[in-house]
Design a protein with these regions (language model features):
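Flexible loop/hinge segments at secondary-structure junctions
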Residues: 19-394
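N-terminal signal peptide c-region/cleavage motif recognized by signal peptidases
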Residues: 14-16
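Positively charged n-region of N-terminal signal peptides that target proteins for export
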Residues: 1-4
Length: 394
């Protein structure tokens, strides 16, 4: 009942005046994440609030990946009394869905160092400094990045060379139709979306031409509101675009040295991220999840470690009562266990990768269809390993 009353206050009086203290929420875990991870935070936040075995409240704010890295490396607190986001439980709001707004709570008056920080690309793209001994890094799902255009645009593809001249030289690049720098919508230099694209088209992040936006929603608004749709182009996380396919299109990208342009998915309308998983689409990064550890390397906050292990696709104790892989797939990310290529730095060369516990068959069944054989205790696999009802490679 207490949280039903607090929820009513939060809904009735927006802003800090009506925000309940975050510390009063059930088992709060504080996160600072990239805005490309908002959809994951909302879905996972709901599931963890209602996770009977271990209820957790994800309390989060969004910021650029480079800012997030510095925040946890330096143990810098989130400002005291800052408004943070969280998701209601089923008991608090049964009608809430991942498309609904988050709720607001107020950070502790003395501030709070994030329990978890997220970078949506290799940390080395932001800093050459190694993590301090008090911070550990875990690789999570893979994040693709796209070049988006308004639905009214007739453009369908772009090459490495064209992107280099468009974003490196703007109007002087003379790449039709992308010559109007006021119609080129990019991000600020701490954001993974810009840094990932910068590494993939060889244009330093601070040299890009275009209108710099702090958040993905601003890029989306600029694209959808453009009065010059043929000239408009912007950079987004693929999972941001996946939720806006009715209003935006993306460009197939031909990377340097390639002979054809590819979408992240096998077609412009599918959601299978096949070309990301097999290396044909090259603009992607791993998500990195950071937590604080003690002098012995043990998590300072075990429940934060629990959350990170979930996101990374690992088994946790106690077991969850929802399907984490299905959640990751639903927001447009790719579980590491479904990837078949890897790289070691942003924009680096790709090499073949075989996950220790493959989940390709299950992932494909979630986002499209799979040709994999099914299995059960009474119907074992003729080859491979039976996992989640499918015969995986290993």
């Amino acid at each position: 009942m207490r949280w039903l009353l607090l929820l009513a206050v939060a809904l009735a009086v927006p802003g800090s005046a009506g925000a309940a203290p975050c510390s009063d929420l059930p088992n709060p875990i504080y996160l600072q994440v990239g805005d490309t991870q908002t959809n994951l935070m909302k879905r996972l936040g709901r599931a963890l609030r209602d996770n009977d075995a271990k209820p957790v409240t994800l309390v989060f704010k969004t910021a650029g990946s480079c800012v997030n890295i510095a925040q946890i490396y330096d143990a810098t607190p989130i400002a005291g009394n800052e408004n943070l986001q969280y998701v209601p439980s089923m008991a608090e709001d049964a009608a809430w869905t991942p498309t609904s707004p988050t709720l607001t709570c107020q950070a502790p008056a003395g501030g709070v160092v994030p329990d978890i920080a997220n970078s949506a690309l290799f940390n080395s793209a932001c800093t050459t400094s190694p993590p301090p001994s008090t911070v550990t890094l875990t690789t999570g799902p893979t994040q693709a990045y796209v070049l988006a255009v308004p639905e009214a645009s007739q453009q369908t593809a772009i090459t490495f060379e064209e992107a280099y001249f468009v974003f490196g030289f703007g109007q002087l690049g003379q790449i039709i139709p992308w010559m109007d720098e006021t119609q080129m919508f990019i991000r600020t230099v701490t954001k993974s979306t810009l840094l990932a694209w910068a590494a993939n088209i060889s244009v330093p992040a601070d040299k890009w031409k275009g209108v710099r936006h702090d958040g993905s929603p601003m890029v989306v608004s600029s694209l959808t509101g453009s009065t010059s749709p043929e000239a408009a182009i912007g950079i987004l996380g693929a999972e941001v675009y996946d939720g806006l396919r009715d209003t935006l299109n993306i460009l197939a990208f031909r990377a340097k040295g390639q002979y054809a342009a590819y979408y992240p998915d096998s077609t412009s309308t599918s959601r299978d991220k096949k070309n990301v998983r097999d290396g044909h689409y090259t603009v992607w990064s791993p998500t990195i999840w950071m937590e604080t550890v003690d002098g012995s390397g043990n998590p300072v906050k075990p429940d934060a470690h629990y959350v990170i292990q979930l996101i990374a696709g690992r088994s946790v104790t106690p077991a969850i009562d929802f399907d984490m892989q299905a959640m990751v797939a639903a927001v447009g990310l790719v579980p590491d266990c479904a990837m078949h290529v890897k790289r070691s730095f942003e924009g680096g060369k790709l090499s073949l990768y075989q996950p220790a516990e493959d989940c390709t068959c299950k992932y494909e069944s979630l986002v499209d269809t799979t040709s994999c054989a099914t299995c059960s205790p009474s119907q074992p696999c003729s080859s491979g390993v039976c996992r989640d009802g499918f015969c995986e490679v290993q």
